[in-house]
Each structure stands twice: as structure tokens, then as C-alpha cells.
């Protein structure tokens, strides 16, 4: 079924910044997608086109990207008369229209909005849910797998004040029997965590960051992990709920010195206290020995490949090492990471690569190498729930979409609750097998 109309506009994301929304009209009606955006972005990501006009939205406007959809993509794609069910052909056409390697001409945010809306239109035409269409596109087997939610409950790094260098601490309810129960456990721990945080750090420490986690004035990773393990214990889930970290260490890597500055938010940081990657790797190993850590994302900087390979080699496969800034959902970097044994899991962000087809291929490349795949939101999110359907359709088994707070985060988690209810016994919960869910 061809497309009769494509229209884009700007709307606002969860940080109050403009972002791209795309409507596609076919015989089945209107299909809408909204594109997210990140705060700590990898330097190799596909180009998110912003206006750069400092007099409006501090340069973060997306009127150029919107115009590119309305004036370049819309007439060309409608004229091409492609079937919306042929996602690969649509995405290839969009990439050809752009003609650059990282979508700098039209903008990945413009292209992705169209790509996502096309997938929704195709699902409607096939009269199946979006997750079932994604499953068809990626050729995954049945039953469907419901993901373990990685809930970011304590924020540090670039997402928060305080001196804590690591960006995210997540709870992982992998011991639950179902997604519904995992959500309940996670929500209960989150409530305990909020009240503990207020008790220890004062009332205002209960305020939440961009992704719904608390951001108290914490100095060290141990302090954050103690707070979380205490909350897990108070909620009665010790042993069932694990912990994950996203270090986002590119944010505090000093490239010239090849060292890491754990006090990077202090303008007068003491250079003599900056540490080597070996010292940082030792810290991770000590933390993993003391706390139930099952996954560490971006433990080293995106260009510090040597550090990644060293850590992979010396840490064994006890926990998941996730590449985000390292791999930026890009087939070239994923291939390099596989060859150099840099990590064993991919963080999949559709807006890092810019089309549904390329996101699916990135996941398939990762699965083929025996990696895990974690589907992820961005810190600037919207009410769009496409990634909830993607994680189920891909059988990825793990999703990172913030704390059980703030509607733009819960929109995705609530969508997975609905999917679980709809599928009933035609789905299994990934649980402790989240790293190898594709094989379940």
C-alpha cells in the first residue's frame, strides 16, 4: 500500500527541547512517530540535525529537519510509490536521498521519524501489532520474549549535580517470573529508594533527574550502590534484583593524558588523582565483587579501544559489558568491537543509526557474534513507544528506559505490560537469561 501524505512538525521532548514528529497517511489512516534525542552523545552517532540559531531554543531548533521531511522526503517518497511493508526498500531510498554516510544532509532525526512512521503504517496494513511486524522484518523465531527492564534509579555524571562521576545506576528485576511482576518489584524498590534518599540526603534529594532517577549529592559509586542495595533489602528482594551501571566514561576521559578524571565536575580537579584504564578496570572488578552487578555499560571512553579489550580479557564473562558510545549502533564499529573483543553486548538506540532497517541489522550482527542486545531510550524522550515494540519484536530480552517515574519513561514500560497481557502464554519473560534471550 502506497503513502498518500507525509507531514512533519516539531513538538517538544521531555527536556523541553524541540524534536521531530512525522505523520504518514495511507488507506489505513494516520500513523505517527516522534524522534528522541540524547544528552551524552557518542561522537560517531548519525547526525541529529539542529538549526544552530542561538536566538531560538538556544540553537536546538529542528525546523530544518522538519522542512527536510516536508520538502525533500515527502514528495520524493510519495512519487517513488513504495509499499510501506517493504521497510528495507523505504529505508534504502531515504539513505540514498540523503547520500552521506551519517545522514548529515537531511538529518537522522528527519529520516528516523519517517522510517518509524512507515513501520507503524505497515503493521496497520497487515493488521498486526507493531512488535509482530518488527518480528517479521527481523525474522526472529517464536515465542516472543518480554524484556527485563533496566531501571535507572540513581543518576550521576552528566545527568546530575553532586560529584558522582558514573552516570546511571540501574536495578534489574531479572529474578521475577514475569514482566508484570518485574515492574511491581522495580516500582516497590524505587519507592523505598526515594524515601531512603530523602532520609539520608534531605527532602530535595528525592527530586528526579531527566530519566526519573534520584540525583542526591553522592560522592562515590559505593555510596550509590549502598543506597540501592539497602532499598532492595527494605523491599524484600535481596538476591532477586540485580544492579547495572552505565558509566558513560567518555564524559570524564582526558584524551591527551589518556586518563580518567572521577572528579570531572570540579573545575579545580586534581590532576595527580586522575587514573589509568587499568586502575579504573580494577575499580569495576572490586565493585562487581562486592555488589550484585550484572552489566556495565561504557566502562571506558569511546576511542579508548585498548582499555575495552583489556577489560574484556581480564574480567572474564562474569558480567555483560555493553558498548554504547563505543558502538553507536553502527555496523562498522560493531564489527570492530567484535573483532577486537571489546565488549559482549550492544546498546541499541534507533536514533544513533537513523532507520528501522539499520537498527534491526545492528541487532542481528550482534546476536550473530553471541552478544546481548539492550534496546534503549534517550534522555530526551517523548510519549512515542516504538522501542517497546522493537525490544519484543527483536527478542532482545532487555530494555533500558528509565525509572518507573515520568510518563515518557513509563509509556514504554506500560506498553510492554499491554503486550504481555495480549500475548499471554505466547510469550516468555527473559529473566536471568536476558543476555541470551535470542536463543530462548
UniProtKB/Swiss-Prot annotation:
Q: Which organism is it from?
A: Davidiella tassiana
Q: Which PANTHER family match?
A: ENOLASE
Protein name, as recorded: Enolase
**SMART domains per the UniProt record, alphabetical:** Enolase_C, Enolase_N
Instruction: Please list the residues that bind Mg(2+).
Output: 246, 297, 324
Q: In which pathway does it act?
A: Carbohydrate degradation; glycolysis; pyruvate from D-glyceraldehyde 3-phosphate: step 4/5
Q: Where does substrate bind?
A: 159, 168, 297, 324, 376-379, 400
Cofactor note as given: Mg(2+) is required for catalysis and for stabilizing the dimer.
Q: Which reaction does it catalyse?
A: (2R)-2-phosphoglycerate = phosphoenolpyruvate + H2O
**Where, by residue number, is the active site?**
211 (proton donor), 349 (proton acceptor)
Subcellular location per the Swiss-Prot or TrEMBL entry? Cytoplasm
Amino acid at each position: 500500500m502506497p503513502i498518500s501524505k507525509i507531514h512533519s512538525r516539531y513538538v517538544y521532548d521531555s527536556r523541553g527541547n524541540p524534536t521531530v514528529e512525522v505523520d504518514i497517511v495511507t488507506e489505513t489512516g494516520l500513523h505517527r512517530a516522534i524522534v528522541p534525542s540524547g544528552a551524552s552523545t557518542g561522537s560517531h552517532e548519525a547526525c541529529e540535525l539542529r538549526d544552530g540559531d542561538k536566538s531560538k531554543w538556544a540553537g536546538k531548533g529542528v525546523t530544518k529537519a522538519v522542512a527536510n521531511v516536508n520538502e525533500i522526503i515527502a514528495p520524493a517518497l510519495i512519487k517513488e510509490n513504495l509499499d510501506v511493508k517493504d521497510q528495507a526498500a523505504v529505508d534504502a531510498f531515504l539513505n540514498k536521498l540523503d547520500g552521506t554516510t551519517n545522514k548529515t544532509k537531511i538529518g537522522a532525526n528527519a529520516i528516523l521519524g519517517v522510517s518509524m512512521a512507515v513501520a507503524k503504517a505497515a503493521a496497520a496494513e497487515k493488521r498486526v501489532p507493531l512488535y509482530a511486524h518488527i518480528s517479521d522484518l527481523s525474522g526472529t523465531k517464536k515465542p516472543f520474549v518480554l524484556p527485563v527492564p533496566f531501571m535507572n534509579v540513581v543518576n550521576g555524571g552528566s545527568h546530575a549535580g553532586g560529584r558522582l562521576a558514573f552516570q546511571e545506576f540501574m536495578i534489574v528485576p531479572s529474578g521475577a517470573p514475569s514482566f508484570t511482576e518485574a515492574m511491581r518489584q522495580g516500582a516497590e524498590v524505587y519507592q523505598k529508594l526515594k524515601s531512603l534518599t530523602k532520609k539520608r540526603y534531605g527532602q530535595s534529594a528525592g527530586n528526579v533527574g531527566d530519566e526519573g532517577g534520584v540525583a542526591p549529592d553522592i560522592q562515590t559509586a559505593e555510596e550509590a550502590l549502598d543506597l540501592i542495595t539497602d532499598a532492595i533489602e527494605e523491599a524484600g528482594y535481596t538476591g532477586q534484583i540485580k544492579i547495572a551501571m552505565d558509566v558513560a566514561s567518555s564524559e570524564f576521559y582526558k584524551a591527551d593524558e589518556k586518563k580518567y578524571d572521577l572528579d570531572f565536575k570540579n573545575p579545580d580537579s586534581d590532576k595527580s588523582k586522575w587514573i589509568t584504564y587499568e586502575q579504573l578496570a580494577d575499580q569495576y572488578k572490586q565493585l562487581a565483587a562486592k555488589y550484585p552487578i550484572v552489566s556495565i555499560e561504557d566502562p571506558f571512553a569511546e576511542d579508548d579501544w585498548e582499555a575495552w579489550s583489556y577489560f574484556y580479557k581480564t574480567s572474564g564473562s562474569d558480567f555483560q559489558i555493553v558498548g554504547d558510545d563505543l558502538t553507536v549502533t553502527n555496523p562498522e564499529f560493531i564489527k570492530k568491537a567484535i573483532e577486537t573483543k571489546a565488549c559482549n553486548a550492544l546498546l541499541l538506540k534507533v536514533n544513533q543509526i537513523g532507520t528501522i532497517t539499520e537498527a534491526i541489522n545492528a541487532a542481528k550482527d550482534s546476536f550473530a557474534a553471541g552478544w546481548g542486545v539492550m534496546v534503549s531510550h534517550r534522555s530526551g524522550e517523548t510519549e512515542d513507544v516504538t522501542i517497546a515494540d522493537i525490544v519484543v519484536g527483536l527478542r532482545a530480552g532487555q530494555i533500558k528506559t528509565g525509572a518507573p517515574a515520568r510518563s515518557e519513561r513509563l509509556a514504554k514500560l506500560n506498553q510492554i505490560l499491554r503486550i504481555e497481557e495480549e500475548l499471554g502464554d505466547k510469550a516468555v519473560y527473559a529473566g536471568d537469561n536476558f543476555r541470551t534471550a535470542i536463543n530462548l
